[in-house]
């Protein structure tokens, strides 16, 4: 009903869907012979949003299949196929468990995940990408800042507070979220021997994490507990929150190698070269007892039944990381130069040289950006003030010997320079 009859309402327009007049709503949008108000538009958007969520690329039970999860991970993370498969299956089973928890008498246990791998190999990126795929609240916590309650540092409950903030204080949504705890190898037991001094940042933190990882109703202060002690607490059940712990575990490979050596005494003893296999190969033979020797307490290891090990990134993988993923570094810098109207090109030799420098630094993929910044810093400083630059070419000399990248000028600029001289 676009118009109502009557002398007073001759010039008044009405929403064709809900019948409200233009004076009762904030906005009335006109179409051919019909009108729609802003309230009806919002209602339609909500309906479409709900439909999109329920009819996405999902398996029969409403959860992405492991193959679908792995395929999306491939777009962002290069290599690490074993870790991707382990994560895909674990996450699929976790959310399948939530969706079918009330349909059977059999209670399915939660499977938290432990990611072990050298720095810069993709542990954090895997966790972030998983949260993006599943459209659930996600938060990251640094285990090195955590302490037992009552000591200087962050309480374990602050992790749940960050998850609540990520879900815009929607408790139900937060209770299905993902928490990634980084640097978990830094909270290992400081010593096997009992000490007079309390270990508040090592074993103490492991003990504090046990309850929220297993499942408990945590009382979370919305504004942080220490500065606002009088506020009301929110109750958050952590039973269905998926915890992913990650760490480099430097030195763990030596414990694994030592266990695998066996006896080294006698004429029949087998002599093995400790450097014959890489860190990634040794991590594949990881047993829970190795983590106990490293300094994790048995109860903490027991809360992390799914273990995914990641390997060092080789030269070919680093070159691929530079060029192929959706947010590849080369694509990012090319976009920056494109804004200046300049094409940025890297030669194949230059990309290989950058990968070699990253391997030498032992920083993995994380070190690639700092190397790129070093190479392009002077060029990015001078480029906005230069005229007629058409292309910047980064070659092997620019990476290895500190030479400036090549600047290619347009033909017009070359002719101007020739006539001026």
Curated annotation (Swiss-Prot):
Gene Ontology CC terms: HslUV protease complex
From the UniProt record, list the coiled-coil ranges: none
Q: Which UniProt keywords apply?
A: ATP-binding, Chaperone, Metal-binding, Nucleotide-binding, Zinc
Report residues binding ATP.
Answer: 118-125
For this chain, one GO molecular function annotation is: zinc ion binding
Q: Name one GO biological process term.
A: cell division
Domain ClpX-type ZB: start-end pairs? 3-56
Residue positions annotated to bind Zn(2+) are 15, 18, 37, 40
What's the stated role of this polypeptide?
A: ATP-dependent specificity component of the Clp protease. It directs the protease to specific substrates. Can perform chaperone functions in the absence of ClpP.
Q: Give the family, as the similarity comment puts it.
A: Belongs to the ClpX chaperone family.
Q: How does it assemble?
A: Component of the ClpX-ClpP complex. Forms a hexameric ring that, in the presence of ATP, binds to fourteen ClpP subunits assembled into a disk-like structure with a central cavity, resembling the structure of eukaryotic proteasomes.
Q: Spell out the protein name for this chain.
A: ATP-dependent Clp protease ATP-binding subunit ClpX
Task: Give the species this sequence originates from.
Answer: Cereibacter sphaeroides (strain ATCC 17029 / ATH 2.4.9) (Rhodobacter sphaeroides)
The gene name reads clpX
